[in-house]
Amino acid sequence: QNDHEYGGIGVAVADRPGGPYKDALGKPLIDRIVNGAQPIDQFVFRDDGTHYMYYGGWHHCNMVKLSDDLLSVVPFDDGETYKSVTPENYVEGPFMFKRGGKYYFMWSEGGWGGPDYSVAYAIADSPFGPFERIGKILQQDPEIATGAGHHSVIRIPGKDEYYIVYHRRPLGATAMGHRQTCIDRMEFDADGFIKPVKMTFEGVKPVRIK
């Protein structure tokens, strides 16, 4: 691991979601390894008006605070700029969402090119953690697919209805790059824990959002 290895996080801007996008900085926002984290797989999370960014590969995850215009990294109140928030078994692909006053931190485990790629999670009272690993909620199914991981989560506005979007490898596929983007329902039990996701071939039905 050194600063010559592949990685870098940039910022692009556009007038509408469909683009076209242009580089906002002319250089990477983060282009070096800090706390062992390869600068990839960024996720921006807004909490109480503040934007935080979680990122990192190589089994390390950092958290940074973004400026109001999202174009720079600024120090936290304690003066620290990069906070290591790496949970047990973390590999890459961090994701955060808030539900019922709790912070759900999710990540991918295993190697993306193998069958054991999967998604695990933790629940915390703060966006800073600590993030104690609870367990896997998405992993290979010998009847459906292997290598299920690197996800995002969608919530239907105004409803407690969640979906997980991820990639997986079809059964029998051997090429590392042979992956499919899929979506399935993600549900919670009465105590707020995420139920194991059941992969399907059908996915989910369209949902109209006003």
Where are these regions (language model features)?
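Carbohydrate-active catalytic/glycan-binding domains of CAZyme proteins
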Residues: 1-210
